[in-house]
Amino acid sequence: MSFQEVWEKEPMKKPRIQKVTVNFGVGEAGDRLTIGAKVIEELTGQSPVRTLAKQTNPAFGIRKKLPIGLKVTLRGKNAEEFLGNAFTAFKTSGKVLYASSFDQVGNFSFGVPEHIDFPGQKYDPSIGIYGMDVCVTFEKSGYRVKSRKVKRSHIPKKHLVTKDEAIEYIQTKFDTEVVRE
C-alpha cells in the first residue's frame, strides 16, 4: 500500500509542514546585515530576527554577542509559498536534493546559493548576492500533545514522520525530484 493510499484512507497520518526556517549567515555586522534584512524581508514578507555570535573570533573580526546573521520562521501558507519559490531557485542553480539531506523524522535542509535565483528577483550591484539555508520541519496531526501545557504527552513512534513519508510528500506536493544515492 503506497503512502498516497494510506493518506487518503487515514488523513491523520498525512505529514504537513510545521515550519520553514530561513537562515542568512552574513558573517559581519553593519551595512551588509542591514541590506540582508531588506532582502530576506522582500523574499519572505516577514521581518527577520538578528542572530548573535556565540564566541569571539579575532581572525574574522567577530566579537561575542555581535549580530552576524538573520533568520525568519514561516508557518502555514506563507511557508508553503516560500518553499515552492525556494525549490524553483534551488533547481535554477543546477542543484539536486539528495535523500541524505533528510533526517530520520523527515526534516531536511538545503542551501540556495544566490537570492537572485528566486522568481522576480534581479541583480542589483548595490545589494550584491546573498545565499541562504532553508530548513523544513514536518509534523502530523496530533503533534500538539507534546507541546501543550496541560496533560502533556509524547508522540508514539508509529505516528512520527518517517524519512520516506517526507520524501514522498515533497515529491508530490512540490514536484521536486529527490535523488537516492
Curated annotation (Swiss-Prot):
Keyword Transport: no
NCBIfam families: PRK04219.1
Subunit structure: Part of the 50S ribosomal subunit; contacts the 5S rRNA and probably tRNA. Forms a bridge to the 30S subunit in the 70S ribosome.
Assigned keywords, A-Z: Ribonucleoprotein, Ribosomal protein, RNA-binding, rRNA-binding, tRNA-binding
Record InterPro entries: Ribosomal_uL5, Ribosomal_uL5_arc, Ribosomal_uL5_C, Ribosomal_uL5_CS, Ribosomal_uL5_dom_sf, Ribosomal_uL5_N
PROSITE patterns referenced in this protein's UniProt entry, alphabetically: RIBOSOMAL_L5
Protein name from the UniProt record: Large ribosomal subunit protein uL5
Aminoacyl-tRNA synthetase found in the keyword field: no
Function (record text): This is one of the proteins that bind and probably mediate the attachment of the 5S RNA into the large ribosomal subunit, where it forms part of the central protuberance. In the 70S ribosome it contacts protein S13 of the 30S subunit (bridge B1b), connecting the 2 subunits; this bridge is implicated in subunit movement. May contact the P site tRNA; the 5S rRNA and some of its associated proteins might help stabilize positioning of ribosome-bound tRNAs.
Family in the record: Belongs to the universal ribosomal protein uL5 family.
GO BP terms: translation
GO MF annotations in UniProt: rRNA binding; structural constituent of ribosome; tRNA binding
GO CC aspect terms: ribonucleoprotein complex; ribosome
